């Protein structure tokens, strides 16, 4: 019995190579060959092969490979229907494989001259591949995409930034201290923390050292002192793990309210190997295992915004220092800023 036409509202066939299957077809292979050759003459058909295969119940179905010189643009799903027989329609991605498949039983008729065909990567793929292989930096990569694919650049920049960061991982900038050790001073409690926990011999694996919390007035040199102690990750305003230096010996959290610090227990508790979710990026594991120096002013005192349980954890993992009146981190002879 003839099969019903495909029901689709958006059918479109654009290809030079077509593979059709007519299940339980009532038409002969010869009639189908002549019908399709005439029907596809406007697309400069140059080869057709039709194979007859019998079902177990004895009814035939026909396989058909078509090769065109001009690219088809067919929107009517009933275009290939013959005598009430409607085929399954799909592009032939590899004409040689399709011809081999339909010829397995040997019952094949052909017309025209067969040409080997295999779908090659699209021009778009080739252009993307060239960009990926030739760009030497994130900036050059994005500039090349902007020139070649302006629509993608305008509408998918967030994802392109992500792929750029995968190809060219951001390298952390090493902070260069603007003040020398002689220009700075610190309270003896802070000096003790620095010397015992930061300037120390490599500690035994699995041990954790306390973080440091400094709360006090603005423009007293807290940030300058904290950033002068060695290689570190620095966050101001927000915590962003996009660029994280695994070789840093400590982190600085500067003027960020407690409620905006994600994974604060992992950070303050000097925990190792925890997972973060960077902005515009996928989750990744952070090496961690280094203490934090938390800096804030009196109006953003973290302890005022913590529950009793949070305070208990915080004080067990962090040394707190509230600056006294007139305390400064600048040595008397240095100029403050």
From Swiss-Prot:
Q: Which SUPFAM superfamilies match?
A: Origin of replication-binding domain, RBD-like (SSF55464), P-loop containing nucleoside triphosphate hydrolases (SSF52540)
What EC number(s) is this enzyme filed under? 2.7.7.-, 3.1.21.-
Where's the motif RCR-1?
19-22
Q: Which residues are named in the active-site annotation?
A: 101
Q: Please tell me the species this chain comes from.
A: Tobacco yellow dwarf virus (strain Australia) (TYDV)
Query: Where in the cell is the protein located?
Result: Host nucleus
What name does the UniProt record give this protein? Replication-associated protein
Q: Cellular component GO terms, alphabetically?
A: host cell nucleus
The protein's UniProt keywords, in alphabetical order, are:
ATP-binding, Covalent protein-DNA linkage, DNA replication, DNA-binding, Endonuclease, Helicase, Host nucleus, Hydrolase, Metal-binding, Multifunctional enzyme, Nuclease, Nucleotide-binding, Nucleotidyltransferase, Repressor, Transferase
């Amino acid at each position: 019995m003839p099969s019903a036409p495909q029901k689709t509202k958006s059918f479109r066939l654009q290809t030079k190579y077509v593979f059709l299957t007519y299940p339980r077809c009532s038409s002969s292979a010869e009639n189908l060959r002549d019908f399709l050759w005439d029907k596809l003459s406007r697309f400069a058909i140059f080869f057709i092969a039709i194979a007859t295969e019998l079902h177990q119940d004895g009814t035939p179905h026909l396989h058909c490979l078509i090769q065109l010189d001009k690219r088809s643009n067919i929107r009517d799903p009933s275009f290939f229907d013959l005598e009430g027989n409607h085929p399954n329609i799909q592009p032939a991605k590899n004409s040689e494989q399709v011809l081999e498949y339909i010829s397995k039983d040997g019952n094949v008729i052909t017309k025209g001259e067969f040409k080997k065909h295999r779908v090659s990567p699209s021009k778009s793929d080739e252009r993307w591949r060239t960009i990926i292989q030739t760009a030497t930096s994130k900036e050059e990569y994005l500039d090349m995409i902007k020139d070649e694919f302006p629509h993608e650049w305008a509408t998918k920049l967030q994802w392109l930034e992500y792929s750029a960061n995968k190809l060219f991982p951001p390298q952390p900038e090493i902070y260069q201290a603007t003040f020398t050790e002689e220009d700075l001073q610190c309270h003896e409690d802070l000096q003790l923390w620095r010397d015992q926990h930061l300037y120390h011999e490599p500690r035994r694996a699995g041990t954790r050292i306390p973080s440091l919390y400094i709360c006090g007035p603005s423009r007293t040199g807290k940030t300058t002192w904290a950033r002068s102690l060695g290689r570190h990750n620095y966050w101001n305003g927000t915590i962003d793990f996009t660029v994280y230096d695994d070789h840093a010996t400590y982190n600085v959290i500067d003027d960020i309210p407690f409620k905006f610090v994600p994974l604060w227990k992992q950070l303050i508790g000097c925990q190792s190997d925890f997972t973060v979710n960077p902005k515009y990026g996928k989750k990744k594991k952070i090496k961690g295992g280094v203490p934090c120096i938390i800096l804030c002013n009196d109006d953003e005192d973290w302890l005022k915004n913590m529950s009793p349980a949070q305070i208990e954890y915080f004080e067990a993992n962090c040394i707190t220092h509230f600056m006294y009146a007139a305390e400064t981190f600048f040595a008397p002879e240095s100029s403050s800023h």
